[in-house]
């Protein structure tokens, strides 16, 4: 499956308003893209059978373009079938034995997405990711003739900063990562037999968890790389959004210069959260006054102060460990004083801390020098694969609970307690890879 053609930001903004279409005498109303506050619920019925009242039909030839504002991304091998029956919504569906993408043009904001999954003729297994591979639904199974409705909340964004300016994007953010910034909501349907009958999308005003950090946090666009930030979405209920503004190669200083913090603060509302994890690239910076307890700590405080000024709740995360074992199979300290600087600032400013540095040390040592390789991308001791980032996301969740942070109330009921010293065996982990892959390491290795 190919990603959509990449175009410059200036050519990509699409003001779609009230597109009204009549096709094949069905008289359906097309998707109107308006300001979020007045935008109606968007309802799509997948398959060539009867169309449920109030829904827009989607068939295999419904390919996304800027005029319609919705459709499958080009390159998918999709089959849409009608099974017959009285229930217009569940009597037809679209499926594939390969991953496929469906996109809808929408303004920046948070959206509640409800999917109807299943097939009257066979069992189904569906995994859903959003935007740049954010895990929304890990595995939804339905038996033959059974259907499941699932709801999740997705954040979409643009580079524009309210008031003035825009985020200074890196080249990769304009190409392989463009889905993170375009004016579209993109869903990836994956696993052995994904089957989608319907999708409903509506704008919602809900609390948002913003993430800022480096390549170990950001939405990695390509396999085999992944981060805890793009796995974290799986563990939260609908009704709270996660907006991942982290980026590969970033330090506190470079994120400030690129206006990433400005962007987050421009959309942050009172009661929102900001989770901050830097250090991997900050420790490489050189010069007078540069150091863990000087420039790093001072810049980190700017993030804390900025969030609080907007009525937000900052959370400080110590940098995740690198895979660096000594002769005794213990993790060495590759971050110097930077984790301690985070701990100090958290205490001084009364900010809830998540000590991922300490938890990842326990995690890696539990695996040991050999098994730990299974949690990282090949020939990489910094960046994780799907399994490694999933386990680290569990560490973050455990840290949220341990720190008694308010957002713990938004965790899903099936999220069990996690002990980093006893990681899940890799044999128990099954995550279908997304289609696009690249062996080039993320920035900031």
Where are these regions (language model features)?
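Short, structured coil segments at secondary-structure junctions
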Residues: 130-131, 236-238, 310, 349
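Conserved beta-strand scaffold positions in the cores of enzyme catalytic domains, especially
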Residues: 43, 242-244, 350-353
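Compositionally biased, intrinsically disordered or flexible polar/acidic segments
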Residues: 36-222
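Short, flexible loop segments at the rims of nucleotide/cofactor-binding pockets, characterized by
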Residues: 91-93, 250-255, 330-332
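Alpha-helical cap/lid subdomain in secreted, periplasmic
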Residues: 259-413, 421, 432-445
